[in-house]
Amino acid sequence: MKPLSSPLQQYWQTVVERLPEPLAEESLSAQAKSVLTFSDFLQDSIIAHPEWLTELESQPPQADEWQHYAAWLQEALSNVSDEAGLMRELRLFRRRIMVRIAWAQTLALVTEESILQQLSHLAETLIVAARDWLYDACCREWGTPCNAQGEAQPLLILGMGKLGGGELNFSSDIDLIFAWPEHGCTQGGRRELDNAQFFTRMGQRLIKVQDQPTQDGFVYRVDMRLRPFGESGPLVLSFAALEDYYQEQGRDWERYAMVKARIMGDSDGVYANELRAMLRPFVFRRYIDFSVIQSLRNMKGMIAREVRRRGLTDNIKLGAGGIREIEFIVQVFQLIRGGREPSLQSRSLLPTLSAIAALHLLSENDAEQLRVAYLFLRRLENLLQSINDEQTQTLPFDELNRARLAWAMDFADWPQLTGVLTAHMANVRRVFNELIGDDESETQEESLSEQWRELWQDALQEDDTTPVLAHLSEDDRKQVLMLIADFRKELDKRTIGPRGRQVLDHLMPHLLSDVCAREDAAVTLSRITALLVGIVTRTTYLELLSEFPAALKHLISLCAASPMIASQLARYPLLLDELLDPNTLYQPTATDAYRDELRQYLLRVPEDDEEQQLEALRQFKQAQLLRIAAADIAGTLPVMKVSDHLTWLAEAMIDAVVQQAWVQMVARYGKPNHLNEREGRGFAVVGYGKLGGWELGYSSDLDLIFLHDCPMDAMTDGEREIDGRQFYLRLAQRIMHLFSTRTSSGILYEVDARLRPSGAAGMLVTSAEAFADYQKNEAWTWEHQALVRARVVYGDPQLTAHFDAVRREIMTLPREGKTLQTEVREMREKMRAHLGNKHRDRFDIKADEGGITDIEFITQYLVLRYAHEKPKLTRWSDNVRILELLAQNDIMEEQEAMALTRAYTTLRDELHHLALQELPGHVSEDCFTAERELVRASWQKWLVEE
């Protein structure tokens, strides 16, 4: 054995001071002194358990002693009666055996291959023993999980990565996947559980037993993220679920990981063989698969970026020429040719490397250089980790640990060790570059593009830094990283398929580049990822955004400007087609062309297919809403024009809905026979409120009433004859149904018909004569106010003329000014008490004093008060033109009318923009103070003062 170097001899004196009396210096062998000097982990363990040193001296570690681990552990667990005892014994056993392995490794008593084998078998032994103990305990508690035939179902554990390959390093996480064969329920327990519940609960307990820290430490840190759907997926899957996932969604990196998958414990059972046979076609393709090279190149690029980002210099695993590159080289050949060459299907690296050389896929010299480098690097890695039982692959910077490694690796000093290490890593790097490609020579533009790809693909943590987000505040940067991470987790839950992932991987770096250039990157990204979640399973939409950069830019700008638009696009992705043509996107349909465009749109759909007709109506409306909102955001439509377009759109919809309902009713009952002597349908739809006043907003309801002029004795002329007035009632009911039916594209409009005579208690459809009689003899003043903002939005000329005449007659009735003033004011006060602002220190733009409703009440009062003298005041139903009429007819001074108009349009404009932001219609108390003061003054003048 090589004597300790000078720095280590000096350090030995420090070790001596720590040793308890049973470990007096003079009683220690040269081997013990060397090992205790090399490893703090060994020092701590032997000081805590001096009897272990006696055992090591009397029964030195052997290369094949891994064969006894299971029996030794079984003996240690023989008296364990509870989970706490299980955890304690597992931890003590692991530490005791790790001390033996570290002793053998430090003194080079066995080969490095043997060390890897022992570390892997130890982990497998501990996992299987814990599983078997817990399975028995869980069966006693819940019954035995069985399939439909009553056969007991086991928990199978796939060891992944180095554990699966039998190459575990000294301090390592263990990557596991849990599976059970068939669905069923437990039998023989106090309560019945289905197998999924049983194995999930058991799996959770198994993980806790392994990785929960106690006073005795932990056994292994358990990583379950390699399972299907990652952290968001079920903890345990049935064979059927596993097979479905890997056939439908398995990704290249999952093939890469599955190469090393090994069933822990008894791997010769029926279920183990079934699981192996099921996974083999996914891992090893029957054909030669060269596409894997690019996938591995991408993965290597991701690792290289992580090394740069985290500053992982001197990393013997992830750095250039490190352990990971040797693994990549070997697995390239396994994944490309493993389906045809059984000798390449080994889970372990060194046997596979020999097979690669035997098949002449690498030269003998290259294969030998890789073998020697691998064993050198793995010994260095394990020695490094055994110093403190610490999971690290980064070479030390302190002199003591450098001296320790140089001595244990049999070098005179640190420079000699690093010289040989550099040569080995250079050999690995050369072979890797020849096979997979060099990723070092990239232009500045490619480097920037790579950084965006890194941001998308590398699952950065919130505290990671990346130069492309340097311009954002710390909070925004963390928010962006969290949004990307959450989106990626959401993707794992969905069936996307290889093509969808490929398109997404192409799209996302471009999208992130554009979004993150904005100051509002976090907000915009939150809206867009919500949209993308809804379309990731529909590759066509992803391709649209990927193939048309202009469409992507429009999407980003619209989502940034309006969460309402983002929500609409997320709910109805068909609207994404509208992003393709900016000429139409920001140019709404001409106000007089909505009916024609809708008619043309509906021609694509069979007239007798009601479901498709309803869907088409909703899709047309949403597309037009998007175009109106886009123009609004772009500033090409002032508030008055926005409402004009929304109103014309609603009228086109009403026209089409009445047409559909009419065709359906006539097909069922025939037409009312009084129509045989006249043109038209004898039916009208009257719009009240915002629709009647040309003032619709983005989410406005439609206030409608329905009129007919059908005589009492009319009947329909179809085979199923019914009363004519009954026909119109059913027509109105059908119209309401067509508006409110919820399809995959939502409802068309919310419709409120309570403004009809007698309100909700009245008939849904009213005869023109009954409407006139009600307005003259029964209607309240507030109903006459509502009539000011009413107009026919659908109807034949005869009925329209009749309604206009009734409206004019009612509005021009002489009214006593004081009484009218009192009634209007009291109604407003009731409304304010019922609907007024419930938010302290906020101003409700519509309902509060000085808001929109006050302006509407002022105009309605003045029309009802003065139309008897000035009948021209009845001409228009919208507030802006009524204010013009009041000025023109010398009721209101022009300056006041213009000021109220400005206040009204300003407040409505704010409501539109709040709607685009999906915000409620109230603002800070100190907003719009000038407008509110003006409205209050007008209110005082017209509705309070005598």
From Swiss-Prot:
The keyword Zinc-finger does not apply. Its cofactor is Mg(2+). SUPFAM superfamilies: Nucleotidyltransferase, Nucleotidyltransferase substrate binding subunit/domain. GO terms for biological process: regulation of glutamine family amino acid metabolic process. One of its GO terms (molecular function) is [glutamine synthetase]-adenylyl-L-tyrosine phosphorylase activity. It holds the Pfam family GlnE. GO terms for cellular component: cytosol. It comes from the Bacteria. Keywords: ATP-binding, Magnesium, Multifunctional enzyme, Nucleotide-binding, Nucleotidyltransferase, Transferase. Residues 449-946 are annotated as: Adenylyl transferase. Gene3D superfamilies: 1.20.120.1510, Beta Polymerase, domain 2 (3.30.460.10), Glutamine synthase adenylyltransferase GlnE (1.10.4050.10), Nucleotidyltransferases domain 2 (1.20.120.330). InterPro entries: GlnE, GlnE_rpt_dom, NT_sf, PII_UdlTrfase/GS_AdlTrfase. The keyword Phosphoprotein does not apply. Residues 1-440 are annotated as: Adenylyl removase. CDD domains: NT_GlnE_GlnD_like. Its EC number is 2.7.7.89, 2.7.7.42. It catalyses: [glutamine synthetase]-O(4)-(5'-adenylyl)-L-tyrosine + phosphate = [glutamine synthetase]-L-tyrosine + ADP; [glutamine synthetase]-L-tyrosine + ATP = [glutamine synthetase]-O(4)-(5'-adenylyl)-L-tyrosine + diphosphate. Belongs to the GlnE family. PANTHER family: BIFUNCTIONAL GLUTAMINE SYNTHETASE ADENYLYLTRANSFERASE_ADENYLYL-REMOVING ENZYME, GLUTAMINE SYNTHETASE ADENYLYLTRANSFERASE. This is Bifunctional glutamine synthetase adenylyltransferase/adenylyl-removing enzyme.
